[in-house]
Regions:
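Residue-level detector of alpha-helical transmembrane segments in integral membrane proteins
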Residues: 1, 13-14, 243
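Extended soluble regions of mature proteins
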Residues: 24-262
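Bacterial N-terminal signal peptides
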Residues: 8-19
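Positively charged n-region of N-terminal signal peptides that target proteins for export
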Residues: 1-8
C-alpha cells in the first residue's frame, strides 16, 4: 500500500532529513538525491538542537518544507506555493499506521484465495510498499571510494543475503560533527518508525560498528526498496546560526486537515 498524500513525498524527506544539529550553531547540510530514473533533486537540511527543517519539491513541483519539532513531537508539512500546511503528531502517525496495518491484513487475507500466478503478481506489486517491519540490514566493509571532496570507507548492506544498500562513510570529525549532533535524527526516525519502518533506519546518521555494522557518517547512501533505488550524496556542510522563523510555519499560511492533498 502506498503512503497516502500528502505523506508520499514525506518518505523521501525523512530519508534525507535526519541530519545533525550544531553544538554552538545550527548546521546547514546540502544533499542531492536521485530516485529511480527521475531527475536529481537538491535538498537543504537546517538543524538546531531539537528542530529540523527540510526544503524540497513536492511531486506536483511545488516548493515544500518539512518542519520537525523534536521536543513537542510534531511534524508540519508546508506547501509554500499554496500557502498551506498540515500538522501531524505522534498520535496521528500511530493512528494512521494502525489503519494501514488493518488494510494490509485484509489484502493478505484476500490474496490467500487468489490463483497462484495472480497472487505472485500481487505480492511483487506490493513488495516494498507495505509497512511491515523490515529485516535489519547487515553491513560489510568492502573497500574505499571518493565522494565529492571526501575519501570514504565503502560498505555493502544485506537483508536475508540480498544486497539492498551501499554506504560510503567518513569520520564525523572530518565534517565537524560530534555524537551529540545526531540526537534529533534519532527522534525523527522513531517518530515515523511505525508508519515507515523501511525508511526509519535509512536516515543520515552516525554509524556504530557494534550496533549497525558500519562506522562514521555516510556521505553517500544507496538504498533499494522493491524495484526502486534511491541515491543520496552529501555535497556541502556548514555551521551557521538560524533565526527562529526558520523552524516555524510562515505567518498567514492556512492549516489544512490531516490527509488533505498538499
Amino acid at each position: 500500500m502506498r503512503v497516502p498524500p500528502p505523506f508520499a513525498w514525506l518518505v523521501a524527506a525523512v530519508c534525507v532529513a535526519a541530519s545533525p544539529p550544531g553544538a554552538s550553531a545550527g548546521v546547514l547540510i546540502v544533499e542531492k538525491t536521485t530516485t529511480g530514473g527521475g531527475p536529481t533533486q537538491t535538498h537543504q537540511v537546517m538543524i538546531e538542537k531539537d528542530s529540523m527543517r527540510v526544503e524540497h519539491d513536492t511531486p506536483s513541483g511545488d516548493k515544500g518544507t518539512v518542519l520537525f519539532d523534536g521536543t513537542k513531537q510534531v511534524t508540519r508539512l508546508v506547501n509554500h506555493d499554496k500557502k498551506t500546511y498540515t500538522e501531524m503528531t505522534k498520535a496521528d502517525v500511530d493512528a494512521m499506521s494502525q489503519r494501514m496495518e488493518g488494510v494490509m491484513a485484509q489484502m493478505q487475507e484476500h490474496m490467500k484465495h487468489m490463483p497462484p500466478e495472480q497472487r505472485a503478481r500481487m505480492e511483487e506489486k506490493m513488495k516494498g510498499r507495505m509497512a511491515a517491519a523490515p529485516v535489519k540490514i547487515t553491513y560489510r566493509k568492502v573497500g574505499s571510494d571518493t565522494v565529492g571532496a571526501w575519501t570514504c570507507d565503502r560498505y555493502d548492506g544485506y537483508q536475508d543475503g540480498q544486497k539492498v544498500a551501499e554506504l560510503c562513510t567518513v569520520d564525523p570529525t572530518v565534517l565537524g560533527f560530534v555524537p551529540e549532533d545526531f540526537e534529533v535524527s534519532k527522534k525523527l526516525g522513531e517518530f515515523f518508525r511505525r508508519l515507515m519502518p523501511q525508511n526509519a533506519d535509512n536516515v543520515f546518521r552516525l554509524g556504530n560498528a557494534e550496533d549497525q555494522g558500519f562506522s562514521g557518517v555516510p556521505v553517500k547512501r544507496v538504498f533499494t526498496v522493491g524495484q526502486r533505488q534511491t541515491v543520496t550524496e552529501l555535497t556541502r556542510v556548514t555551521r551557521e546560526p538560524f533565526p527562529a522563523s526558520t523552524f516555524a510555519v510562515p505567518e498567514g499560511f492556512q492549516r489544512q486537515a490531516l490527509g488533505a492533498r498538499q
